[in-house]
């Protein structure tokens, strides 16, 4: 009719595009197999029609670049550079060929370790508790574990807002990374009141008795987590 407009969409559906090959350019130490192993994007194979293997997803591929960087950081390559990948499609638009340029750089070891800021223990005691050690190959995941452990140590003693910042100094000539943990503990936090909301299964005191702390105690992350596990074990709540 003169007052209506019909709109038609013509869809030309193609077969699923498959990642045929991933090529790494410039990797002298890490093998292609190692690098492909950390990526979410995988090359297609004869079982690809049954699984998602070989499927190209742009968001997953963007994460892959971060995963490759993390892999190198965990193996001492603190100056690694992952270049912009190139993605080429086959003439029949069925396959993708991906090339990823890499500048690995050199392996770095840990040099001097130190602490600064607001310490709850002596520097010697804090250093003794670290997993990372001077002279060993730099490993960012291992460093992350130490940062988490320091966070937990402070949060279990009332410092719920502690801030742990790793400060690095890279010596390109000696191939070492000096590392200083800067600790800002913030104000000490106490349990003022334990409130129970949304409970329709039992009396509130049944829930409160699962806490190993009382009102007025310093906040303690470990005790909060333990109370949560004990409450789950009661099977009253989801």
Indicate where each model-derived feature is located.
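Interaction-mediating elements
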Residues: 1-234
């Amino acid at each position: 009719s003169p007052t209506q407009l019909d709109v038609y969409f013509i869809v030309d559906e193609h077969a699923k595009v498959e990642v045929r090959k991933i090529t790494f350019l410039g990797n002298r130490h890490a093998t292609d197999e190692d690098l492909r192993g950390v990526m979410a994007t995988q090359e297609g194979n004869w079982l690809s029609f049954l699984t998602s293997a070989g499927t190209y997803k742009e968001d997953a591929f963007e994460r892959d670049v971060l995963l490759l960087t993390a892999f190198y950081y965990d193996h001492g390559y603190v100056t690694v550079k992952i270049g912009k990948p190139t993605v080429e499609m086959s003439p029949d638009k069925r396959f993708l060929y991906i090339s990823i340029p890499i500048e690995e750089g050199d392996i770095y070891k840990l040099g001097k370790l130190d602490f600064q800021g607001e310490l709850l223990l002596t520097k010697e005691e804090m250093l003794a508790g670290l997993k990372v050690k001077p002279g060993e190959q730099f490993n960012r995941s291992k460093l992350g574990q130490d940062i988490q452990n320091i966070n937990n140590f402070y949060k279990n003693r009332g410092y719920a807002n502690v801030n742990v910042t790793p400060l690095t100094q890279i010596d390109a000539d000696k191939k070492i990374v000096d590392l200083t943990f800067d600790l800002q503990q913030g104000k000490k936090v106490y349990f003022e009141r334990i409130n129970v909301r949304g409970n329709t299964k039992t009396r509130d005191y049944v829930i409160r008795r699962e806490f190993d702390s009382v009102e007025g105690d310093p906040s303690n992350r470990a005790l909060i987590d333990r109370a949560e596990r004990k409450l789950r074990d009661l099977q009253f709540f989801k």
